[in-house]
Amino acid sequence: MKNFLMIVLLTITAQLNAGNVMDPYQGYVYKTYVNSQRNFMIKYPSFLTMGRSSETNDGQSFTANGGAVYVSATSSYFTNYEGSMQSRYADDLNNTDYYINYKRPLSSNWYVVSGIKRSNNKVFYKKVYISNSYNGTQIRTMYLEYPNSWTVTFDEVIPVMLKSFKDTNVEEYN
């Protein structure tokens, strides 16, 4: 009986202590990434680690959870050689690696596709828009990829990132 009570007490203590383990992805704050060369910005949660900038400084990638979570915000100069917005949207819709369960059809200058990436079974979310920046027309892309277990976290994070993913006034951030 004494052993039984000891096991029950240890089990209850372990359960109480497990409840006190803080989730490292709770209580985050938002940081701001500003690309002054391409004139755009995005807010990102502090649990993401900023990667190295590309050689062309066309954007930034972020990771978490040992790389299981991947986020990027990029901008490239728009050329017809790479295709129109309509062809880019069609390419995303026809991407055989994407199982799309949400799409925001192409409007005059932006679209969204989201779903499951078949090759790694992760959730993806992609927003693409055209920017008529002072230094030329650019295609801006926000791309997120994360395990399904992160859905609750990203349901909170994505709206903030979307709202903040925008052009900047060059004087404002230089």
Where are these regions (language model features)?
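Sec-dependent N-terminal signal peptides
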Residues: F4-A14
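Boundary at the C-terminal end of the N-terminal hydrophobic targeting segment
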Residues: L16-A18
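N-terminal "mature-domain start" segment
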Residues: V21-T56
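Extracytoplasmic/secreted proteins, especially bacterial periplasmic and envelope-associated proteins
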Residues: K43, S84, R88, E156-V160, ...
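Surface-exposed amphipathic alpha-helical segments
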Residues: L48, Q138-N174
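Conserved polar/disulfide-associated segments of primarily extracytoplasmic proteins
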Residues: G51-T153
